[in-house]
From Swiss-Prot:
Predominant location category: cytoplasm
Pfam families in alphabetical order: SmpB (PF01668)
Native organism taxonomy: Bacteria, Pseudomonadati, Thermodesulfobacteriota, Desulfobulbia, Desulfobulbales
Location relative to the cell: Cytoplasm
Function description: Required for rescue of stalled ribosomes mediated by trans-translation. Binds to transfer-messenger RNA (tmRNA), required for stable association of tmRNA with ribosomes. tmRNA and SmpB together mimic tRNA shape, replacing the anticodon stem-loop with SmpB. tmRNA is encoded by the ssrA gene; the 2 termini fold to resemble tRNA(Ala) and it encodes a 'tag peptide', a short internal open reading frame. During trans-translation Ala-aminoacylated tmRNA acts like a tRNA, entering the A-site of stalled ribosomes, displacing the stalled mRNA.
Keyword field contains Cytoplasm: yes
A GO term, aspect molecular function: RNA binding
Organism domain of life: Bacteria
GO biological process: trans-translation
Name of the molecule in the record: SsrA-binding protein
Keywords, in A-Z order: Cytoplasm, RNA-binding
PANTHER family listed in its UniProt record: SSRA-BINDING PROTEIN, TMRNA-BINDING COMPONENT OF TRANS-TRANSLATION TAGGING COMPLEX
Length: 151
């Protein structure tokens, strides 16, 4: 079966320089899991913060309402708790206090036993000229690949 990727945050790689990645579990309700299995999630504006109780919380991640549920609908943009080891939380809390670092969601996926996981990236924002340099580099690679294919 392997890993089934539900949604990716492609914009994150353009807007941020990813320094390190972490894997975390998510506390979800039943309809949210079913909605994610259908690929109905959006990570674009999401971010993670550690609250006063030392828990990692996921903000602004949109998981659409599951259309076949009949009981209490869940708020699509609700704050969700993330499950990390205490040691990882302390390490992340120290790094997040550094200037310019943020913790952003990169992708949501399901592992073999059916549990939803989220990959988080410790990121530093890119300047406009860094974004332009990255785009030029990607275009150069595409041109080279195109020339190599033509032979």
């Amino acid at each position: 079966m392997g890993i089934k990727i539900v949604c990716k945050n492609k914009k994150a790689y353009h807007e941020y320089e990813i320094l390190d990645t972490y894997e975390a579990g998510m506390v979800l309700s039943g309809p949210e899991v079913k909605s994610l299995r259908g690929g109905r999630g959006n990570l674009v504006d999401g971010h993670v913060a550690i609250n006063a109780r030392g828990e990692a919380m996921l903000y602004n991640v949109h998981i659409s309402h599951y259309m076949f549920t009949s009981h209490n609908p869940v708020e699509p943009l609700r704050v969700r708790k993330l499950l990390l080891h205490k040691r990882e939380l302390h390490k992340l809390n120290g790094k997040l206090k550094e200037k310019g670092l943020a913790l952003i969601p990169l992708k949501i996926y399901f592992i073999e036993n059916g549990k939803a996981k989220i990959e988080l990236g410790l990121a530093k924002g890119k300047k406009m000229y860094d974004k332009r340099a990255t785009l030029k580099e990607q275009q150069g690679k595409r041109e080279l690949a195109r020339v190599m294919r033509r032979g």
